[in-house]
From Swiss-Prot:
Keyword Nucleus among record annotations: yes
Record localization: Nucleus
UniProt name for this protein: Mediator of RNA polymerase II transcription subunit 18
Organism of this sequence: Eremothecium gossypii (strain ATCC 10895 / CBS 109.51 / FGSC 9923 / NRRL Y-1056) (Yeast)
Subunit structure as annotated in this protein's UniProt entry: Component of the Mediator complex.
Length: 258
């Protein structure tokens, strides 16, 4: 089970170029464009699911998140660098709506793989220096059947569609293992084609790194120190902080939606 250590912040659109220049100068590296489609599903309420395990311990139902990378050729732009982020000012992402609507129903050998993950609620405590969250992740490379899709795969697992969003932005891969993301998010409202900007007039900032084992305290402490050092280096530009852990709770019945 991977432990993800992270810090978050936000900036307005006018601060984007300065932040890119700052991180480029600190790291000596160039930003990389990325785009992904995300679908969050929840357990089917029509199923009578036991809420205790074999040891009679309470087990809470959890949402699952599916993520698929969006190929750059699907972006409605001729700019395939971080500069695209400065042009994303509307209520919808620069991606074909028809393509986004088809992703959950696509099937066949040409379908791109999906990342399937479960996120635990972040660790509690007054003295936390970073957000620490356990993540279980797998890859769905294909689904069986003549008319299979990721939707039918979820249904067989006992899950039904929840909500969808698109994330598009740029990221730096820092030498100490930290991934520094600057991105925009859009919520997708079914197959109507309607979208709404979650990060309107600004960008979400996330700095994170993954530790393969929760028992590797040395790596966790080292990762925490790296994130704290980055926080100090950027204190004149933005405030990296720990979000409210309740907003990152993926358990059913807890606030976690847009």
């Amino acid at each position: 089970m991977v432990q993800q250590l992270s810090l978050y912040s936000v900036i307005d659109e006018g601060s984007f170029d300065l932040l890119i220049a700052t991180i480029s100068a600190l790291s000596g590296r160039s930003p990389v464009l990325f785009a992904n489609y995300n679908h969050v599903a929840h357990p089917n309420p029509n199923y009578a699911i036991e809420k205790v395990n074999a040891k009679n311990q309470l087990v809470e139902q959890t949402r699952v998140q599916l993520m698929q990378e969006i190929p750059f050729e699907k972006l409605q732009t001729e700019e395939y660098s971080y500069k695209l982020c400065t042009k994303m000012t509307g209520d919808g992402p620069p991606i074909e709506t028809e393509y986004l609507n088809s992703l959950m129903r696509s099937c066949g050998d040409g379908t791109r793989p999906w990342s399937l993950s479960l996120w635990d609620i972040p660790s509690a405590g007054k003295d936390r220096k970073v957000c620490t969250q356990a993540v279980v992740e797998s890859v769905v490379t294909s689904t069986g059947g003549a008319h299979s899709s990721i939707l039918s795969f979820l249904a067989e697992l006992g899950y039904v569609p929840g909500y969808q969003f698109v994330q598009l932005g740029t990221q730096f891969y820092l030498e100490n293992g930290i991934v520094f993301q600057i991105s925009k998010l859009w919520a997708l409202h079914g197959e109507s084609g309607k979208t709404s900007a979650v990060t309107k007039d600004g960008f979400l900032i996330k700095a994170y790194l993954n530790v393969p084992k929760a028992t590797d305290l040395e790596s966790i402490n080292q990762g925490t120190a790296h994130l704290q050092q980055l926080k100090r280096e950027l204190r004149d530009y933005l405030e990296l902080s720990i979000p409210d852990r309740k907003s990152m709770d993926s358990r059913v019945g807890h606030l976690n939606d847009f």
